[in-house]
Each structure stands twice: as structure tokens, then as C-alpha cells.
UniProtKB/Swiss-Prot annotation:
A Gene Ontology biological process term: ethylene-activated signaling pathway
InterPro entries per record: AP2/ERF_dom, AP2/ERF_dom_sf, DNA-bd_dom_sf, ERF_plant
Record's keyword terms, sorted: Activator, DNA-binding, Ethylene signaling pathway, Nucleus, Plant defense, Transcription, Transcription regulation
Region entry Disordered, spans: 28-48
Signals that turn on the gene: Ethylene induction is completely dependent on a functional ETHYLENE-INSENSITIVE2 (EIN2). Wounding as well as cold stress induction does not require EIN2. Transcripts accumulate strongly in cycloheximide-treated plants, a protein synthesis inhibitor. Seems to not be influenced by jasmonate, Alternaria brassicicola, exogenous abscisic acid (ABA), cold, heat, NaCl or drought stress.
DNA-binding region of this protein: 155-213
Identification of the protein by name: Ethylene-responsive transcription factor 5
Bias-annotated ranges (Low complexity): 35-48
Classification via Pfam families: AP2
GO cellular component, as recorded: nucleus
Function per UniProt: Acts as a transcriptional activator. Binds to the GCC-box pathogenesis-related promoter element. Involved in the regulation of gene expression by stress factors and by components of stress signal transduction pathways.
Amino acid sequence: MATPNEVSALWFIEKHLLDEASPVATDPWMKHESSSATESSSDSSSIIFGSSSSSFAPIDFSESVCKPEIIDLDTPRSMEFLSIPFEFDSEVSVSDFDFKPSNQNQNQFEPELKSQIRKPPLKISLPAKTEWIQFAAENTKPEVTKPVSEEEKKHYRGVRQRPWGKFAAEIRDPNKRGSRVWLGTFDTAIEAARAYDEAAFRLRGSKAILNFPLEVGKWKPRADEGEKKRKRDDDEKVTVVEKVLKTEQSVDVNGGETFPFVTSNLTELCDWDLTGFLNFPLLSPLSPHPPFGYSQLTVV
């Protein structure tokens, strides 16, 4: 049930909109409609006020009616507005709000629409390894790679390779504060590793870490290896050529004994007689011996 204040407000709005002074009332059709509306509103108001007369006092609507007339109708602009007739078109223009973009605009907004649409995550698998094929000239020969033996690849304990290709073996002696003990130089890394294993087993026993633990007790004696090395060193030495001393026989001028001019052995020199050595002919131009081709000279 509406309150009296709400009913009075509705009645005032209807009177203001459908009154003869309003522009809407100029249209005869609207006037007829307004008259019918006023009659219905008056009937409804009479019914409402008739039913509520017992409980409510009569309401004075003079104040509510006069206030909007003072605000809206006293100004000259409102009078001019009332004097000008208005015509309202009953036809309703229906505008098409469906936006149909052109092909050019559609192409421009396509990336934005696609970016807004969230795509499901993709599972990216790693591509297969690709091998590059290098095309070379027909005359070029492929490089021949020398196969590296397992012996050169593997590093043995206690073995070092020299720059010239030999392999040296050494071990640290725990009894001498970890000082290095030289074990020798070998042609192959396996020989050097076996020499290290033998020395490590002698120093540490069963606690030694060996290169070939299954060969314990099967090592060859190194005496033979020492003899081979010594023989190889002897072959590398330069042999000294001994000079053979020639012997000459002295000429016996006076019919005396002949003595060797130069001896080939020291033993013959020791067996000489001193008297024979003193009688050795002089090799001087003053010598009286004609076989040398010089005549005897006289000193004045």
C-alpha cells in the first residue's frame, strides 16, 4: 500500500506533465490521453483518500504545487519555451549497432585479438642432432687420423711421459719423508707402471695401491733389464781408434849394434840398455855419419 506522500508526489508529476500548459498537451492525441490519465488518477486518489480518511488527516497540497511553479514558470525562458509548439515524431528510428569492420580494420585488429586469446601450453621437444656435411673438392685427400693406442690414453700411477716420448717411473718413499725415488726410464708406459708396482709393494706391502694388482709376485727380475740397458749404453759410446806406432831400425855405421828407433811397447823401452841409448847417433849436420846425406862440417 503506497503512503500518502508517494501518492501526492505521483499526482503532482502527472499534473505537471499532462497539464494544458505543458508542450505535450498541444497534441490532441496526447491531450486525450492526458484527460483519461487524469480521470484515472483522480479516481485512484479518491479511492485512496476515501479509504484512508478514517486514519489520516486531510493533506494540503498547496505548498507542493506552488514550489515547482515558482522555480520553473516565472522565468522568461520558460515562457518562451511554452509558447513554441513542439512536435514529437512517434516513429522510432532503429539504429544498427552491429559493428561490421572493413577488411583493412579487421586485418589490423587480428594480431591484438589473437594475442588476447590464451593458447594452451605447447610441449616442445628437442630437435634431433644434425650433422653438417662439408662438401670438399674431389682432389683433396681425407686426413688419416692415427689410432691412439690404449696404452697412450691411460694414465698409470707413478708414471710420467717425457717430452721426447720416454716414460719415467718414480715413487715417494715414506721412510724418507716422502722424498722421490727414481726408478728409471722405460720405452713403454706399461714397463714403467710395473716398475712402480714392484717398488710400491716392497715399500708398503699389501697396503700399496698398484696399477696391476693381479701381477703381484710375477714380476721379472730387473737384473736382465739392467744388463740390456748397460749393453745398449756401451754400443752408443764412441770407440776410440788406437794408433799403431811404427818402429824404425837405426843404421849401424861403425859396425855396432842396431837399436830400435821407436818402440811399440813400453816393455821394450824398459829393457833397453843405457849404454846403447848413450851411443845413439846424433841427427845433426855436424854428425860424421854420411848416410844422412850431409858432409862433416868444421867449425872455425
